[in-house]
């Protein structure tokens, strides 16, 4: 881990991530509170805010990954932060003119920009982080995200309630500019080999072919799609767990979110220590088994402490699963395909999650809250099947360049 902290590229990307996480949480909480105040707690407006946040992830990650493979990742990430700054400046000007609906546009722009930045950071990791340190790097990144899941809403709420909307937006400009400055100190990116570029459409097709021709990636894709459906079914119904099963006020849902975040934090730390020592396939199966059990117990439980404990366990397991998948995605995929593979798997996950979210309310009305959570449990158990078929061998990592070349020649 000490060697990782001495890695200049890794530390600069992490510094950028920290600044961006502060900006994202300040933005999320400020926009949520502002929309609720402006619309008198209109659920449709709040839902629209979520759609603006998630729909672009599904739509643009298809092309975002392909373009990230074509573009210089350092410039792409810096440009993403600059575009975020420009969009926020535009929003401030529109709000000054009382066009508050521009808030939705701000969320849309931020979500779109992220689809180009994320695969670019994966390429930076692929180039500058040694293979034996990748698991620790992913685990450290997961730990940071978990910390922000716990403290991000608090920081965002504090900035908005104490300083107001415009100061919140001004702070975003500063944070994104600092992130861009940090990224500008990354080593100069030089393509290690000149790859003949086809059309964007063919680049996207290559990403699909790469995943379909790589058994482990194919199994990960199937698993993640099923997990997305299960997560989509349960996420919108969490507040009903609090109200109907636990008999508490809706505001208590934040305590479950905190338990989840603490679990992810601890899971990230545990994975950072053991990820390189434990068989990733076994960690994957174990994490998903506990996740399935937690869905069942959460649906049946009428005790706040039992539900919180299971949510804590869910956080640990999700952290382990995310770290295993993130590590495999970097180890098994050649550098010039990282963006396209991300742009193949992530949209399927997000699409399945959006389908699950759309079905959740209707399923609950037709059946019951308990049955929906049991369906989610069954889906997670089903998703273990493809993982069991994975065969992670050293040659899968060493021969990935040969696969890229063979696909490119077809």
Could you say what each language-model-derived stretch is?
Residues 32-38, 92-93, 151-171, 244-245, ...:
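Transmembrane alpha-helix termini and helix-breaking/packing motifs in multi-pass membrane transporters
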Residues 58-61, 70, 74-76, 80, ...:
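C-terminal transmembrane bundle of multi-pass solute transporters/carriers
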Residues 32, 88-95, 156, 160, ...:
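Structural signal for membrane-spanning alpha-helices in multi-pass inner-membrane proteins
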Residues 1-55, 214-260:
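Helix-loop boundary and gating motifs at the non-cytosolic
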Residues 93-106, 299-311:
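Helix-loop junctions at membrane interfaces in 12-TM secondary transporters
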Residues 1-10, 189-221, 406-409:
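Juxtamembrane intracellular "pre-TM" segments in multi-pass secondary transporters
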Residues 123, 127, 165, 169-198, ...:
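Helix-loop junctions on the cytosolic side of multi-pass membrane transporters
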Residues 11-29, 52-66, 72-87, 102-161, ...:
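Substrate-agnostic recognition of the 12-TM MFS/MFS-like secondary transporter fold
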């Amino acid at each position: 881990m000490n060697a990782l902290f001495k890695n200049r590229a890794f530390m600069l990307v992490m510094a950028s991530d920290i600044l961006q996480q502060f900006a994202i949480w300040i933005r999320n909480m400020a926009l949520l509170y502002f929309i609720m105040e402006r619309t008198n707690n209109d659920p449709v407006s709040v839902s629209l805010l979520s759609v603006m946040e998630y729909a672009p992830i599904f739509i643009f990650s298809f092309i975002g990954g392909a373009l990230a493979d074509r573009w210089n990742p350092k410039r792409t990430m810096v440009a993403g932060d600059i575009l975020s700054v420009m969009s926020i400046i535009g929003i401030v000007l529109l709000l000054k003119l009382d066009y508050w609906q521009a808030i939705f546009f701000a969320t849309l722009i931020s979500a779109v920009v992220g689809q180009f930045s994320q695969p670019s950071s994966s390429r930076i990791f692929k180039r500058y982080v040694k293979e034996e340190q990748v698991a620790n790097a992913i685990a450290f990144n997961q730990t940071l995200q978990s910390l922000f899941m716990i403290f991000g809403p608090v920081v965002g709420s504090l900035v908005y309630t104490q300083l107001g909307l415009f100061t919140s937006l001004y702070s975003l400009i500063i944070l994104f500019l600092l992130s861009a400055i940090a990224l500008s100190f990354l080593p100069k990116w030089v393509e290690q080999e000149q790859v003949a570029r086809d059309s964007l459409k063919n680049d996207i097709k290559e990403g699909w072919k790469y995943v379909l021709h790589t058994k482990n990636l194919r199994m990960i894709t199937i698993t993640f799609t099923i997990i997305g459906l299960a997560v989509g079914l349960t996420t919108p119904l969490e507040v009903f767990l609090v109200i109907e099963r636990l008999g508490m006020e809706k505001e208590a849902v934040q305590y479950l979110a905190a338990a989840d975040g603490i679990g992810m934090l601890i899971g990230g730390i545990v994975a950072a220590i053991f990820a390189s020592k434990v068989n990733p396939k076994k960690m994957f199966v174990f994490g998903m088994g506990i996740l399935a059990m937690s869905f069942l117990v959460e649906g049946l439980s009428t005790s706040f402490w039992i539900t919180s404990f299971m949510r804590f366990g869910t956080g640990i397991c999700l952290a382990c699963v995310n770290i295993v998948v993130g590590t495999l995605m970097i180890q098994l995929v050649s550098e010039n395909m990282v963006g396209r593979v991300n742009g193949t798997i992530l949209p399927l996950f997000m699409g399945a999650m959006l389908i699950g979210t759309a079905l959740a309310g209707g399923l609950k009305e037709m059946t019951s809250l308990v049955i929906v959570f049991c369906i989610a449990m069954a889906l997670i158990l089903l998703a273990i099947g493809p993982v069991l078929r994975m065969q992670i061998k050293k040659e899968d990592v060493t021969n990935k360049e040969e696969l890229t070349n063979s696909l490119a020649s077809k």
